[in-house]
């Protein structure tokens, strides 16, 4: 049975008041968390379920929790399983970002907020998704590749590395590491890890993170500060510190309805903040504040701001002088520039090539644009990320539609037999007409090219699911 730390109970009850705290404690100890998903609008038309009021275009509450692992469309990136409170960032982006920007999600793993942000940003924006921890950065890269949008760059760096890079952003999301009080309901381990010392360590680390990244935010730019914890040390007190020490103004969101039961400032100060409390609002614990940096923001396309001499760019991609993008692999409505790193070939949207070059020079880039494949000297082997990209020209490749059972076998990286008349070479395999990966047909058998590290490890199967409409 769950028990909450006494120091947590005493402090949080004093902060929230008896009535609010009792609702929180009952939810943590007795209630099930609601199940919710967010659809990928670049791949998916709609989904069953009840719209989430602060993210109505893409967020859905589900009445039950299905076995998501066994839905091939989850692995194809048509939707993402995300708790509802975290989708509040969608409302912040849509309200404060009205034209193309360059944005950084600084602490982005596993990728839920990054993909939510990318869906909400205006077309023509570029999003950097960063994760400082190496193992978590791999999960971030996987989820970004499944999402499939080309205007994203994934990095594995600390804030100080970004400071040195000289890259400048219009918007920065800092979903900072925290004491995790908002996760107590769904993760009992978070309860065991909690301590007052950890809270103290966290609020100090959070200030260091924001301070390190502050110079990367343009004058007049927007900083979205969020945690998944309740205490004021990591929440209101840090927001107040950012305003006083770094020079920022806290901004309010319009249209936040009383019926959503979002709790406001608990410290008696008058600046607007947004706190989701389990048992009160319909989601897990989240705190968010929107801050504007002092100064005048200059509007303009981030691509134009970072463009260099076009002749230099053309010279870089001359035929026979580096990697090339195979004809027909990508949709032709975008200008693509090739890039290569450790035998991996990428297609970078031309408007971002100079920014990509700056990032590649100064940061550890894990993914950018469209990851086409690896070149081992015998031609390009198409990558899983290409199969899942929204820029894939799928009609260029031979395709085989898989049954549900075969799709699950494929995602387990088991052998899947192809029809006898399937052409030799690389074959795009689909499920419900949605690409899920590649096989290499060599005649008497086919090699499953699904990434080993992505495969479904469970042998259990729940049966075919119909959660979203492709």
Identify the role of each PLM range.
Residues 1-45, 63, 294-470:
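Polybasic, low-complexity RNA-engagement segments
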Residues 56-95, 140, 451:
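Class I SAM-dependent transferase core
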């Amino acid at each position: 049975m769950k028990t909450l730390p006494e120091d947590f109970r005493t402090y949080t009850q004093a902060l929230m008041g008896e009535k609010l705290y009792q609702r929180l404690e009952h939810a943590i100890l007795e209630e099930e968390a609601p199940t919710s998903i967010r659809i990928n609008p670049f791949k998916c038309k709609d989904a069953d379920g009840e719209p989430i009021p602060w993210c109505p275009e893409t967020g859905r509450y589900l009445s039950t929790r299905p076995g998501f692992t066994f839905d091939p469309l989850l692995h194809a990136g048509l939707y993402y399983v995300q708790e509802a409170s975290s989708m509040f960032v969608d409302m912040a982006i849509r309200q404060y970002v009205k034209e193309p920007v360059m944005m950084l999600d600084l602490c982005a793993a596993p990728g839920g907020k990054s993909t939510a942000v990318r869906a909400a940003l205006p077309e023509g924006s570029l999003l950097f998704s960063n994760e400082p921890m190496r193992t978590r950065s791999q999960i971030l890269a996987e989820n970004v590749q499944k999402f499939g949008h080309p205007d994203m760059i994934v990095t594995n760096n600390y804030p100080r590395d970004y400071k040195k890079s000289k890259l400048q952003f219009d918007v920065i999301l800092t979903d900072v590491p925290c004491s995790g009080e908002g996760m107590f309901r769904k993760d009992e381990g978070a309860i065991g890890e909690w301590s007052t010392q950890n809270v103290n360590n966290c609020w100090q680390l959070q200030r260091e993170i924001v301070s390190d990244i502050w110079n990367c935010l343009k004058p007049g730019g927007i900083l979205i500060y969020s945690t998944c914890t309740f205490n004021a040390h990591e929440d209101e007190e840090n927001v107040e510190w950012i305003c006083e020490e770094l020079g920022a103004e806290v901004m309010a969101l319009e249209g936040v309805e009383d019926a959503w039961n979002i709790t406001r400032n608990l410290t008696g100060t008058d600046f607007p903040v947004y706190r989701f409390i389990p048992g009160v609002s319909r989601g897990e614990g989240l705190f968010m504040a929107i801050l504007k940096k002092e100064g005048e923001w200059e509007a303009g396309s981030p691509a134009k701001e970072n463009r260099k001499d076009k002749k230099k760019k053309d010279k870089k991609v001359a035929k026979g002088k580096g990697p090339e993008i195979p004809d027909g692999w990508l949709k032709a409505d975008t200008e693509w520039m090739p890039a290569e790193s450790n035998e991996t070939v990428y297609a970078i949207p031309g408007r971002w090539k100079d920014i990509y070059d700056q990032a590649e020079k100064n940061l550890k880039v894990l993914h950018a644009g469209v990851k086409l494949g690896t070149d081992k000297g015998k031609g390009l082997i198409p990558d899983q990320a290409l199969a899942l990209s929204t820029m894939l020209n799928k009609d260029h490749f031979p395709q085989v539609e898989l049954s549900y059972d075969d799709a699950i076998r494929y995602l387990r990286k088991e052998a899947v037999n192809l029809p006898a008349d399937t052409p030799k070479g690389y074959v795009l395999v689909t499920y419900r007409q949605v690409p899920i990966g590649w096989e290499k047909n060599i005649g008497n058998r086919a090699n499953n090219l699904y990434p080993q590290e992505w495969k479904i490890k469970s042998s259990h199967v729940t049966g075919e699911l119909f959660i979203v409409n492709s």
